């Protein structure tokens, strides 16, 4: 209030409101810094005069000398520098700032991980067209990758998981070359003759019935295990008696 009352009415009429507020803020800041410097100034011993009075005890010709005034200025600047450095190091410790930065980074990481989890959890599954039929369970309403009867990812490397030999279709992911083979087995690949990498079949079906038997149904017997003459399982007519 004393600072506000000290403002001259003529100055208030000359300065703009923004300039006036800036001047008041700078005055308060200077007062706060001066009080902070006084707080860090060491107290004199009992019975001793203050530094200003102690420096004033001298002959008049010494007090008015430029050497004495420069000495006083250097002492005051030294005290102000010590107070400022101590307040700066006390208020802003490097360890405290590093800890604050680490805490902020950890909180940001947790926040972004929560956002990622929530976005993945809230992502709705795309519905197929009305005429789409799942070729695994033969039901509508979902894609084959979302079928509840599908094998867990990573359980098998090939579509067929039985113990029979079947017909497989291959496509090299590097050179995009396609080929077919009648010597395809479960969880076994073939080497691309051009890139020399192992390629697993993306489609497998029985040998003698390419378009009939569903490879996902493991309960059926494959035709290659039937008799070639009478088509009866467990008997081979061409075997010499």
Swiss-Prot record:
Please provide an example of a Pfam family that matches this protein in its UniProt record: Zn_ribbon_3CxxC_2
Give the record's keywords alphabetically.
Answer: Metal-binding, Phosphoprotein, Zinc, Zinc-finger
> Which residues are annotated as modified residue Phosphoserine in the UniProt record?
65, 93
- Matching PROSITE patterns, A to Z? ZF_CCHC (PS50158)
Signal peptide span: none
Q: Name one GO molecular function term.
A: nucleic acid binding
Where are the zinc-finger regions (CCHC-type) in this chain? 132-149
- The name under which this protein is listed is Zinc finger CCHC domain-containing protein 24
């Amino acid at each position: 209030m004393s600072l506000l009352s000290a403002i001259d009415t003529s100055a208030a009429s000359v300065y703009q409101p923004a300039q006036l507020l800036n001047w008041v803020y700078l005055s308060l800041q200077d007062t706060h810094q001066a009080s902070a410097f006084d707080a860090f100034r060491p107290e004199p011993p009992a019975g001793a005069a203050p530094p200003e009075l102690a420096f004033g005890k001298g002959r008049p010709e010494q007090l008015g000398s430029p050497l004495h005034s420069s000495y006083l200025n250097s002492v005051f600047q030294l005290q102000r520098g010590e107070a400022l450095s101590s307040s700066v190091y006390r208020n802003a410790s490097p360890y405290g700032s590093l800890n604050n930065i680490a805490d902020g980074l950890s909180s940001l990481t947790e926040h972004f991980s929560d956002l990622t989890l929530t976005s993945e959890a809230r992502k709705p599954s795309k519905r197929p067209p009305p005429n789409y039929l799942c070729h695994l369970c033969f039901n509508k309403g979902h894609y084959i990758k979302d079928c509840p009867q599908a094998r867990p990812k990573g359980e098998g490397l090939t579509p067929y998981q039985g113990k029979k030999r079947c017909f497989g279709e291959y496509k090299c992911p590097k050179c995009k070359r396609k080929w077919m083979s009648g010597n395809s087995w479960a969880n076994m690949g073939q080497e691309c003759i051009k890139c020399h990498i192992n390629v697993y079949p993306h489609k497998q079906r029985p040998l003698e019935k390419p378009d009939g038997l569903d490879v996902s149904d493991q309960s059926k017997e494959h035709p290659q295990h039937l008799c070639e003459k009478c088509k009866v399982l467990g008997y081979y007519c061409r075997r010499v008696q």
